[in-house]
């Protein structure tokens, strides 16, 4: 069965500046997500700095309107509490007045990964705040390019053959696919500039997704282990 992991984050208020969300704000987000009935298989609410992230597993696929609306409603509930408590930057990442089908382009950051679930499935969510959009460029490079850091690049045939990096230029919005090992110098040159060039996706050469990474100016990152 195909499972989708959706991670959607937003800054809707912080205590004393960009520090952390209040307990009341987190609880408002959690209550909204918990009230979603059987829409989700499971969920987790966390934060990094003053960014609240909602981790959801479901069977609706990526870019699903119901899933994105649930996250939007949860952040609106958190915003209401932030205003009542006088938190800093209440609702600042909600750039639109109403939901319009997908949170992309509306302020929140989104990372989603759809895959066939294995018997023992694991994934990791990387979260960061107040940093470069490409802050995870180097660790991802170490994982999928540097055999000194990951012996799987030697013993796993599909990884040994090289993977495909999708790189986004966040200044002009262009995207390029770079393949290992032929494009290694170009990839390394791009990843030296995390303020402009960002890993958007990594796939095997057969097209199997490995991680889904942050979009421009947003985090988080999902890594399927």
Question: For the regions a protein language model found, what residue spans apply to each?
Answer:
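Catalytic-site or vestigial catalytic-site microsegments of nucleotide-handling domains
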Residues: 4-16
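Conserved long alpha-helical elements within nucleotide-processing catalytic cores of c-di-GMP signaling
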Residues: 13-30
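A broadly used, surface-exposed interaction patch
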Residues: 30-37, 54-113
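Short, glycine- and small/hydrophobic-rich beta-strand elements in well-ordered beta-sheets
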Residues: 37-48
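Short acidic-rich active-site patches of cyclic nucleotide enzymes
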Residues: 49-53
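Extended alpha-helical scaffolding regions
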Residues: 108-174
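Eukaryote-biased recognition of electropositive, low-complexity segments
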Residues: 188-194, 198, 202-214
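Conserved small/polar residues in nucleotide/adenosyl-binding loops
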Residues: 215-221
């Amino acid at each position: 069965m195909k499972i989708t992991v959706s991670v959607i984050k937003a800054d809707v208020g912080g205590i004393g500046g960009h520090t952390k969300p209040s307990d009341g704000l987190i609880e408002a987000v959690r209550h909204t997500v918990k009230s979603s009935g059987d829409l989700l298989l499971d969920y987790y609410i966390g934060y990094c700095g003053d960014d609240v992230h909602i981790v959801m597993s479901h069977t609706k696929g990526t870019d699903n309107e119901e899933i994105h609306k649930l996250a939007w409603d949860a952040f609106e509930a958190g915003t209401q509490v932030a205003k009542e408590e006088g938190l800093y930057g209440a609702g600042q990442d909600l750039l639109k007045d109403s939901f319009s089908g997908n949170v992309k382009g509306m302020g929140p950051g989104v990372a989603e990964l759809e895959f066939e679930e294995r018997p023992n499935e694991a994934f990791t969510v990387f979260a960061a705040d107040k940093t470069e959009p490409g802050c995870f460029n180097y660790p991802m490079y170490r994982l999928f390019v540097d055999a000194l850091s990951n012996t799987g690049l030697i013993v796993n045939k599909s990884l040994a053959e090289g993977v495909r990096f999708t790189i986004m230029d966040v200044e002009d919005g262009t995207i390029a696919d770079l393949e290992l090992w032929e494009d290694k110098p170009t990839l390394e040159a791009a990843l030296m500039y995390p303020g402009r060039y960002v890993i958007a996706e990594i796939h095997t050469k057969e097209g199997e997704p490995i991680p889904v990474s942050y979009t421009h100016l947003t985090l988080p990152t999902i890594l399927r282990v």
